């Protein structure tokens, strides 16, 4: 079974990124990653959930984080979703999957330049599914598929929804195979005010769940980055992608500069990088 967690790989990786869910705030992942790369903290493997899977797949496909913004420029939320008569979700993700297919060079996870593990929730069996091979667009869509808002995604006769329901910050996914894990959590806070409508109430309720299951994962990371000032963004404000990117970039630079002053030896250890196993195989 593809979602099984046993024996994915026997490789060891120097540094892994674990990227949380967070909907529109996922653009802060790209900013945080840009800052990390500029400090020479490069991942050999990425684990992503929902918005983190989306950010991770574009980087693993060979794109610099700041360049990914170009793919979304000029798009609105409604360009990537399709409003449907509510049956199992308000929107379906066919346009989103087409967008991924049009803008990614790789079509399958195993074709990416960097190993990427995408986490979704198996709706039929109530368990986590960790995808490391197969069609990219289907698996990213499955991981992003927040119940009620989006219709579940069917893969090989099984329905999947947002991985954040069970694990919104996927550190455990790669913890045992990485020397160091950098976790980026872009959904640590919630706005104090919210609208009383079906979408707003559903999203706020999910956020309580996401925060709760992220607490144990936060403790497992070697470096935790939680960009601030993200709680005021609406999940449909795609036009603010660059602004959200800069929030992640600036917050991460602040954290890294502080660590360089305070941590010394620990920081030098984290900065150690080595080629990924796929790089070694290609040489």
Give the positions of each predicted feature.
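Single conserved hydrophobic/aromatic residue that forms the stacking wall/gate
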Residues: 272-283
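Patatin-like phospholipase
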Residues: 1-49, 57-274
């Amino acid at each position: 079974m593809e979602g099984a967690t046993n024996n994915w790989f026997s490789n060891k990786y120097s540094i892994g990124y674990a990227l949380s869910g967070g909907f529109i705030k996922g653009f802060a992942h790209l900013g945080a990653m840009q800052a990390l790369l500029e400090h020479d903290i490069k991942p050999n493997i990425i684990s992503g959930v929902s918005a983190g899977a989306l950010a991770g797949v574009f980087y693993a496909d060979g794109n610099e984080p700041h360049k990914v913004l170009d793919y979304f420029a000029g798009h609105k939320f409604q360009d990537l979703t399709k409003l449907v008569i509510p049956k199992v979700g308000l929107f379906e993700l066919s346009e989103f999957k087409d967008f991924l297919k049009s803008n990614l060079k790789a079509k399958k996870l195993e074709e990416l330049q960097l190993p990427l593990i995408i986490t979704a929730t198996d709706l039929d069996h109530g368990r986590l599914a960790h995808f490391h091979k197969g069609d990219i667009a289907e698996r990213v869509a499955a991981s992003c598929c927040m119940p009620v808002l989006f219709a579940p995604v069917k893969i090989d006769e099984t329905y999947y929804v947002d991985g954040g329901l069970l694990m919104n910050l996927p550190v455990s996914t790669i913890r045992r195979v990485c020397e160091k894990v950098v976790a980026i959590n872009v959904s640590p806070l919630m706005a104090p005010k919210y609208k009383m409508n079906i979408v707003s109430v559903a999203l706020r309720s999910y956020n309580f769940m996401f925060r709760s299951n992220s607490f144990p994962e936060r403790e497992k990371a070697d470096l935790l980055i939680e960009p601030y000032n993200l709680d005021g963004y609406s999940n449909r404000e795609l036009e603010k992608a660059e602004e959200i990117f800069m929030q992640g970039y600036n917050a991460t630079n602040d954290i890294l500069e502080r660590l360089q002053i305070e941590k010394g030896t620990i920081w030098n250890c984290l900065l150690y990088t080595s080629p990924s196993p796929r790089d070694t195989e290609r040489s």
